[in-house]
Amino acid sequence: MNTIKEGQNFKAVDFGSIEKLIDYELPMGPDVLKGKVFGGQAVCATGSEFSFQTLVPGQDGGFLHSHKTHEELYFILRGEGEYQVDGEVFPIREGSVIRVCPDGKRCIRNNGTENLTMLCIQYKANTFGADDNPMTDGNILQEPLNW
């Protein structure tokens, strides 16, 4: 992963191509989880965490898990598989988005014939209220673009 550019209000990082995400390794105790990388700290995120993960055909997440306070959004970027939440199993594929509350017992598996790649975003649950509409929070500025 390489820093592209950073400034007072931003940091941009390159994780490489989707095909190369499989090369990342995440230490988990005595084991190493291949194909997963966290990125929130790399971009200095202050309100969320995110990870990319690639599962090869036949691979699953390895274990059910839940969270204490984090809700998760899973974006399936490539491939197909199945997702399990609280014992419910359903098909997923490129373009699927899954939201799971902190208490949801979850896992993913690739039952397809090609790699499955996803983006997972974690953030504290129940932090957005009725007044947190993205259309009213944004400010359209009357400044020129500097392309």
Feature map (PLM): residue ranges:
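Short, charged/polar surface micro-motifs in flexible loops or helix N-caps
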Residues: C44-S48, V56-D60, E80, K124-T127
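Double-stranded beta-helix
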Residues: C107-W147
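Conserved short histidine dyad/triad with adjacent acidic residue
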Residues: V32-F38, S51-H67
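Short strand-coil-strand connectors
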Residues: T46, Q84-E88
